[in-house]
Amino acid sequence: MSHEFDYIIIGAGSAGNVLATRLTEDADVSVLLLEAGGPDYRLDFRTQMPAALAFPLQGRRYNWAYETDPEPHMNNRRMECGRGKGLGGSSLINGMCYIRGNALDFDNWAKAKGLEDWTYHDCLPYFRKAESRDIGPNDYHGGDGPVSVTTPKAGNNPLFHAMVEAGVQAGYPRTDDLNGYQQEGFGPMDRTVTPQGRRASTARGYLDQARERPNLTIVTHATTDRILFDGKRASGVSYLIGNANDATEARARREVLLCAGAIASPQILQRSGVGPAALLRELDIALVHELPGVGQNLQDHLEMYLQYACTQPVSLYPALKLLNQPGIGAQWLFTGNGIGASNQFEAGGFIRTRPEFAWPNIQFHFLPVAINYNGSNAVNEHGFQAHVGSMRSPSRGRIQLKSKDPRQHPSILFNYMSHEQDWQEFRDAIRITREIMAQPALDSYRGREISPGIDCQSDAELDAFIREHAETAFHPSCSCKMGEDDMAVVDGQGRVHGVQGLRVVDASIMPEIITGNLNATTIMMAEKIADRIRDRQPLPRSNAPYFVAGERPVRGQPQRAVSAA
């Protein structure tokens, strides 16, 4: 194998696979793609069947399974921080919700110096370029991109429709497309699933086009030790194959592209001598360039589950029973449809809880079964639940190396719930969810409140529940943020400040977390920056209109008023 390439990409995840595919469209460009995990085994139902999404989080084959330091505002819990490992990265193990973030997220990014071309109208063409939506393209959606997107269909679980209707009856808007003109309100939720009912990871959508190209070399089980520098120019990568301790080196003629995600990208930069000087000195790492923002500004979405018994036998509870699973698996395997072909997050919504929020600050995912996201703590009866959490918490965390060992996990602290706004939003979210669940649309299905339980009412009781039970939505981001301020790590094209030949392209470069799931936006960002790397003209800006709430009230009159108790 040659050890010199035009580009070396570190991390074959949601962003890295996009770059590998787009850069190798130019036949005279050579690319080395390094992935610490293994292949995306297509015969492994755990990563290929949408309904099996909890399984990869339970093991270590596809999951880095990071843990946080004790979180001081969460009863000092060490909290899960699962990240994808293997071709596809976190798109290989995520919940497959195709949500892009709100138009105003991007317009807000673009207010920062150097990020003027990150408005929604600049980004929308790249969302469309990446997408192939099963019901065809329009001004907001693509029809022939690498990412297969499936829309909910008639005949799916009646609880989805009842929960959306309940949200509308509670006084909130209805929308027919959470990624379309109006991203506020309740409606159906698209998913990254192929027409054959398989998970649409970036390994399937992008790498399948590119993996046979002679100018792309993919190396799996390759753990990056550090980026090599000649002075201040990134010149290559040192990496370990499998369990070996002797490093292999590869050289980059043009650029090194770091796409290892919001946890590993700052870790690799720090190990390579780019980061906070005091930390690097403490670890005896030679300083290449001081960038105090590397590993800072860490953000995530936290969420809770509100669970209810279901009085009719329409939930997915029977699908949790072992005796029913072979039939579900066979139907999925041979026909590509049935329960197995859906992630079961087919309805959701975004709302504003208070007038001071210009765009939604709370997200709902509805699930027609009562169970933890990672498959634990299933309720032993028919049930359903709402996942609810705040979108743009003011809390900020950090990632820092604990040693030079590339196989040691870093110290991670999200500092969840460290602001009063966090507590206010989560209390509001629980109380609003209860109002939604009390609406007439759910009368035929709603049993008792299982969790938190109706005895949990006061601020103090709700706060105790949040501290003990809130969990990550697995959306770490923003730890190598774009911008030009003193804490920015990269510019608006992903180029690392103060050095040459090095970019970061993944969720870590978001300056602020978006309103929703991260995968679609991470792919969009990679598509957009790929054009910059290739020195191509950006796609023409969109002029599609989009909803801005303005002076509209956050909600109308609920059909059934519910006392806050």
From Swiss-Prot:
Q: Where is this region: Disordered?
A: 541-565
Q: Which GO terms describe its cellular component?
A: membrane
The answer to whether UniProt assigns keyword Oxidoreductase to this entry is yes
Pfam families cross-referenced by the UniProt entry: GMC_oxred_C, GMC_oxred_N
Where is the catalytic site?
H475
- Cystine bridges: none
Top-rank taxon: Bacteria
A GO term, aspect molecular function:
betaine-aldehyde dehydrogenase (NAD+) activity
Q: Where does FAD bind?
A: 6-35
Query: Which cofactors go with this protein?
Result: FAD
Entry's Gene Ontology BP terms: glycine betaine biosynthetic process from choline
Task: Give the catalysed reaction(s), semicolon-separated.
Answer: choline + A = betaine aldehyde + AH2; betaine aldehyde + NAD(+) + H2O = glycine betaine + NADH + 2 H(+)
InterPro entries the record matches: BetA, FAD/NAD-bd_sf, GMC_OxRdtase, GMC_OxRdtase_N, GMC_OxRtase_C
Q: Which NCBIfam families match?
A: betA, PRK02106.1
Q: What does this protein do, in the record's words? A: Involved in the biosynthesis of the osmoprotectant glycine betaine. Catalyzes the oxidation of choline to betaine aldehyde and betaine aldehyde to glycine betaine at the same rate.
The family this protein is said to belong to: Belongs to the GMC oxidoreductase family.
What is the protein name given in its UniProt record? Oxygen-dependent choline dehydrogenase
The scientific name of the source species is Ectopseudomonas mendocina (strain ymp)
Q: Which gene encodes it?
A: betA
